Amino acid sequence: MARKKTLDFEQSLTELQTLVERLESGELSLEESLGAFEQGIRLTRECQTSLSQAEQKVQILLERDGELSEAPFDAEGDEA
């Protein structure tokens, strides 16, 4: 089965969770563990990149003086 070059965030996270479970099981050989660890690092980086891009894209639209203006997303949830 051909794999897409990159997975979406949810697929990457699910695959990462599966890898962690396999590693924690203790049933993998050293080579299999190293391969799973390497793949886990790659997936972690992909997830971090996806989250970073999503955070940059998320903006709150505020209505001011009848016009829409964009305000950066406040991750803390502090609204004045």
UniProtKB/Swiss-Prot annotation:
MF terms in GO: exodeoxyribonuclease VII activity
Protein name according to UniProt: Exodeoxyribonuclease 7 small subunit
Compartments it resides in: Cytoplasm
Domain of life per record: Bacteria
Disulfide bonds: none
Assembly and binders: Heterooligomer composed of large and small subunits.
Pfam families noted in UniProt: Exonuc_VII_S (PF02609)
GO biological process, one term: DNA catabolic process
Catalysed conversion reaction: Exonucleolytic cleavage in either 5'- to 3'- or 3'- to 5'-direction to yield nucleoside 5'-phosphates
HAMAP family in the record: Exonuc_7_S
Keyword line: Cytoplasm, Exonuclease, Hydrolase, Nuclease
EC number of the protein: 3.1.11.6
Family statement drawn from the similarity comment of this UniProt entry: Belongs to the XseB family.
Gene3D superfamilies per record: Exonuclease VII, small subunit
Principal location listed in the UniProt entry: cytoplasm
Described function: Bidirectionally degrades single-stranded DNA into large acid-insoluble oligonucleotides, which are then degraded further into small acid-soluble oligonucleotides.
